[in-house]
């Protein structure tokens, strides 16, 4: 049974509250969105709520026309909000596990970085972000995540401090909130 727009908004609200309730929930959400990076945050919440195991999602038409795959009969679509019109409505996407290929083509795979690409990627990151390659790609990416979190805190500190009231962080001073925020954000990004 398809959900209504009202049910969709409730689902997003409930999911946002759930993923921020515990470290395990947040980690589970991050595992889902790591595979679904092209989608906006509300869409990522919706996909996680309806199919946390989803790996590659797109519309029925794109599966047919661009990927030469068909959506299997009986597959349940994942509802996402289409707010491109004056009245928001729901649109549906399907995970690759809901598809098959009439020509027996392999399913599209998410991109990965091969070991042989680490050196080139590390050099490109060093040239762009001035973070030395050092001990390898993983520490470099972790350092980049910390740098990005510190930059974000610097740019949006007052906005973030403005929403701390009523949360468990209201007891902390600005420096402590900043440290907790940058630590959590850099861990989430890395």
Describe each model-derived feature in a short phrase:
Residues 1-190:
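N-terminal accessory/interface modules of nucleic-acid-binding and processing proteins
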């Amino acid at each position: 049974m398809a959900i209504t727009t009202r049910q969709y908004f409730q689902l997003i609200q409930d999911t946002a509250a759930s993923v921020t309730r515990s470290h395990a929930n947040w980690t589970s959400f991050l595992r889902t969105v790591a595979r679904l990076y092209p989608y906006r945050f509300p869409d990522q919440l919706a996909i996680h709520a309806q199919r946390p195991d989803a790996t590659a999602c797109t519309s029925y038409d794109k599966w047919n026309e661009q990927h030469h795959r068909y959506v299997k009969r009986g597959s349940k679509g994942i509802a996402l909000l289409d707010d491109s019109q004056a009245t928001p409505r729901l649109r549906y996407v399907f995970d690759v596990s809901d598809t098959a290929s009439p020509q027996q083509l392999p399913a599209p795979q998410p991109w990965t970085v091969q070991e042989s690409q680490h050196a080139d990627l590390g050099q490109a990151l060093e040239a762009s972000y001035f973070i030395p390659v050092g001990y390898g790609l993983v520490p470099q990416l972790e350092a980049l995540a910390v740098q990005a979190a510190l930059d974000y805190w610097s740019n949006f500190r007052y906005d973030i401090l403005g929403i701390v009231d009523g949360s468990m962080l209201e007891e902390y001073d600005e420096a402590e909130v900043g440290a907790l925020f940058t630590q959590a954000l850099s861990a989430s990004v890395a």
